[in-house]
Amino acid sequence: MPEIIIVKNEAEAGEIYGRCVADLIKAKPDAVLGLATGSSPLAAYQALAKIVKDEAIDVSGVRGFALDEYIGLPLTHPESYHATIHRTVVEPLGLDPAKVHVPGDVLNGTPLEDGDKVALAGPAYDRAIEAAGGIDVQILGIGTDGHVGFNEPGSSLASGTRVKTLAEQTRIDNARFFDNDINQVPTHCITQGIGTIMKARHLVLLAFGAGKAEAIEETVEGGVSAFCPASALQMHPHATIIVDEEAASRLRHKDYYRYAYTHKPAWQGI
């Protein structure tokens, strides 16, 4: 069962994540971070960047692997996840760009039709993560339908990094990054699979707003099912879900989650 932390706002959630990762980097200077895009992690990255600066933490050895990437967008496209990760994580934290990887880096706009090259990129990415020693902390967002990464409902809970077709709802949700024009949103992606994500040593999922309440209810208190990919976190030995009051509004056991978090010993961390 994941630890559930209910916070006032995104800033408080960001502070919790930032402290967790900053302490990790101090203890393990070559830590491997799992990185996600979207709006949910932004406050977390900002909090971490502030701690790194304020405490003069050396991040020169830190490595990173992003969750996913659109297929067909060149790396230079502003909404490619390569560009987004560099804009929101690499530059603010001062990470070495050569040590931060995105699944589509080797594709760089390769069209879906180039099946041989596209199909090989997923297994190669999983091997790269394994060669780095695995991911220490993986940050996650969650879609309104319970997807994590680009693992849409129905994705295998044992899947590795591979090519997926984006659900129409995901394309609608992401159109806000493409001038609200769904026709500009790619139809396919390459994403870490649920099986790949579950190999990370610590998972931290963030969710904010009433629009995520149903997905959080299914993730935390529903059954484990491929139709809510995030529900796989119930099976992870070290998963933390940080939500605001609105995202937690449908949880039946909120009082217990609050009690458990406020009464845990400080040495446990998150």
Curated annotation (Swiss-Prot):
Key word Hydrolase present: yes
CDD domains tied to this protein: GlcN6P_deaminase (cd01399)
Listed pathway(s): Amino-sugar metabolism; N-acetylneuraminate degradation; D-fructose 6-phosphate from N-acetylneuraminate: step 5/5
InterPro entries xref list: Glc/Gal-6P_isomerase, Glucosamine6P_isomerase, Glucosamine6P_isomerase_CS, NagB/RpiA_transferase-like
Known catalytic reactions: alpha-D-glucosamine 6-phosphate + H2O = beta-D-fructose 6-phosphate + NH4(+)
GO cellular component: cytoplasm
GO BP term, example: carbohydrate metabolic process
E.C. number(s) listed in UniProt: 3.5.99.6
Database matches in Gene3D superfamilies: 3.40.50.1360
Highest taxon of source: Bacteria
Entry keyword annotation includes Translocase: no
Gene Ontology molecular-function annotations: glucosamine-6-phosphate deaminase activity; identical protein binding
Keyword annotations: Carbohydrate metabolism, Hydrolase
Record: active site: D68, D145, H147, E152
Alphabetical list of PROSITE patterns matching this protein: GLC_GALNAC_ISOMERASE
Function of the molecule: Catalyzes the reversible isomerization-deamination of glucosamine 6-phosphate (GlcN6P) to form fructose 6-phosphate (Fru6P) and ammonium ion.
HAMAP family (UniProt xref): GlcN6P_deamin
Similarity comment text for this entry: Belongs to the glucosamine/galactosamine-6-phosphate isomerase family. NagB subfamily.
Full protein name: Glucosamine-6-phosphate deaminase
